[in-house]
Amino acid sequence: MTVSLPQKTTASIRWLAAPTSWTWVEQANARPMEVLIDHAHCERKAAGSAVQMMFRYLCEPGLGEALSPLAREELEHFEQVLGLIKSRGRYLEPLPSPGYAAKLARHIRKGEPQRMLDSFLVAGLIEARSHERMALLAEHSPDSELRSLYGDLLASEARHFGLYWVLVEERFSRAVLIERLQTLALAEVAALQGVLDCPEIVRMHSCGVCPV
């Protein structure tokens, strides 16, 4: 498998080794509020991850200036999604995690600078998958309000995984990046393989990808 190389200024979902399956789209459309609430949790966690990396690499030149605005934007998205949830008579209830991010985290190496490289690439892959699935919902959701919401968020999500690519490209050789991205992209697909046992537990990052 060969992962297409993102451009420095215009990354794309070519980060991903396999596309989302139509089964996931159908499951997500059947349980729109569960996916929406999970999406709010995803935005909250993405903000937390950006802040965590900003403080972990506090003295790394340029990281604070890049990650602080990203974290703020993730929180703005969280508030936007939360507002829609509340307008529909629901609240930010706890939801069981599909384990997607935890599976990816196991592939992050412990020593530096490998830990930094893996952390940024994993964060970028998660953003890329979010972008891809939001694009599917923006096109195929039967709910016009949800189509509008997901469509509005697409440009920001693309910027986010593009930013993570730029951050690693500034710090590592291209050959090292591509080799590691290929490995982690396959791990990302493996984290989404399988069949959802219960349609009620569909999440933004629940299983549902096409074969590699």
Predicted segments, located by residue:
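Non-heme di-metal
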Residues: T2-V212
